[in-house]
A protein has these predicted regions:
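Right-hand nucleic-acid polymerase module
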Residues: 285-349
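A conserved non-catalytic segment of reverse transcriptases
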Residues: 163, 239-301, 307-309
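Conserved polymerase palm-domain catalytic core
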Residues: 39-54, 92-257
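Extended C-terminal regions of large enzymes
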Residues: 330-331, 339-394
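Charged boundary/loop elements
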Residues: 1-22, 83-96
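Phosphate/adenylate-binding "loop-and-lid" substructures adjacent to NTP/NAD/dNTP-binding pockets
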Residues: 5, 19-57, 64
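Short acidic (Asp/Glu) and glycine-rich catalytic loops that position anionic groups and cofactors
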Residues: 11-18, 59-61, 89-93, 122-123, ...
């Protein structure tokens, strides 16, 4: 139970409806954990409603994504549940499922897609499940779990989490379907449900890669891709009571390229997609407002964004150096204007790149690229303390 709390603490997160933060919960940790354990053992545990918040899908987007924030106590209980279920289901998952699993990540999903393309699979069914986390029926979740879990207390606990409801603007709303984005156990439950689709695709002979509810089916011909579309639609509708989004699901080719996990993949390159680059720029803009001071705290926040972006996109299979150079130049322009407190200052070019890197300690995206390969750049990871750790992200 203490290990479960450590995981919750490491992931941080805001307080739930009870307004008890992680720090407040930790102040009486043993007492809180003992009470939670008693309630779980006796069956008296009742999850509190989630605090519903809506976050923008992007800085320039008017659309929002609903998140459900559990109270800290419930997060610990969900983490215990996740640790209990994971050893049962992990051996059952398909190898092409790369999301939210031990030892699996986005880069492995992208590498698998690239390797399949190299085998001659040039057509892509780029699939999107309509409102997956919001519309996933509770009955489908419970049926998928119950196939391998017979303990009534565990099943009852899952059911209680699913039906805990949400508080939005002070009003309670029951939850009759879906699993909340933001819930600790939600990614595992998603994998448990979609594992059925994985093995159905495998049994039909299709090659695919899935990361949570984001997946692509890779085919040799356009006709095969059309058949895959019909097959996926049928499995989702008949077995899982879900649907593909007609607007977001389409067939394309590796030559034309497609977007997957923040990248634009094509036969020519693997690079940041335009939306990912725009999100990065929007974050930098918010940190380089001219009226703000370019002090050590500002540099630290800036470096966090640069480091996170570089560590994700500067991989051994991605072509990013040329784009990173342009983005670094754009960042320096923002910093010069910030330093001079005005836009297009005539002599702000006098503040050279070396000034920002050496004197102020601002990282550059390009310095994470230390070598080039067939598809792009190996990279080094620069930890928060500034030490350099060399490695290849494979």
């Amino acid at each position: 139970m203490k290990q479960a709390f450590k995981t919750v603490r490491r992931n941080r997160g805001a307080a739930g409806v009870d307004k008890i933060s992680i720090d407040i919960f930790e102040a009486n940790l043993q007492e809180n954990l003992d009470a939670l354990m008693r309630d779980l053992k006796t069956g008296r545990f009742r999850p509190k409603p989630l605090r519903r918040v809506h976050i923008p899908k992007g800085p320039r987007s008017k659309k929002t994504r609903p998140l459900g924030i559990p109270v800290v106590r419930d997060r610990v209980a969900q983490e215990i549940l996740r640790r209990l279920l994971n050893p049962i289901f992990e051996p059952l998952f398909h190898d092409a499922s790369k999301g939210f699993r031990p030892g699996r990540n986005c880069h492995q999903a992208l590498e698998m897609a690239i390797e399949i393309h190299r085998l001659g699979y040039r057509y892509v069914l780029d699939a999107d499940i309509m409102g997956f986390f919001d519309h996933l029926p509770h009955s489908v979740i419970m049926k998928a779990v119950a196939r391998h879990v017979a303990d009534g207390k565990v099943l009852d606990l899952i059911q209680r989490f699913l039906t805990a409801g949400v508080m939005e603007d002070g009003v309670f709303k029951p939850t009759t379907g879906g699993t909340p984005q933001g819930g600790v156990a939600s990614p595992l439950l998603a994998n448990i449900v979609l594992n059925h689709l994985d093995w159905q695709l495998d049994g039909a002979g299709y090659r695919f890669v899935r990361y949570a509810d984001d997946f692509v089916v890779l085919c040799r011909t356009h006709q095969e891709a059309q058949e895959a579309h019909e097959f996926v639609q049928r499995v989702l509708e008949e077995d899982l009571e879900l649907q593909l989004s007609p607007e977001k699901t389409h067939i394309t080719t590796y030559g034309k390229g497609y977007e997957f996990l923040g990248f634009k993949l094509s036969s020519r390159s693997c690079r940041m997609r335009a939306k990912s680059e725009q999100k990065f720029k929007d974050k930098i803009r918010s940190l380089t407002v001219r009226k703000h001071n370019l002090d050590a705290k500002a540099v630290e926040k800036l470096n966090q964004v640069i480091r996170g972006t570089a560590n994700y996109f500067a991989t051994s299979f991605a072509t990013v150096r040329w784009r990173f150079q342009k983005l670094d130049s754009w960042i320096r322009m923002r910093l010069r204007c910030m330093k001079r407190k005005r836009k297009n200052y005539n002599d702000n070019r006098k503040l050279r790149a070396r000034y920002f890197r050496v004197k102020l300690g601002v990282l550059t995206l390009e310095e994470f690229c230390v070598g080039t390969g067939t598809h792009g750049n190996a990279h080094r990871v620069i930890p928060r303390n500034g030490a350099t750790l060399t490695g290849v992200a494979r």
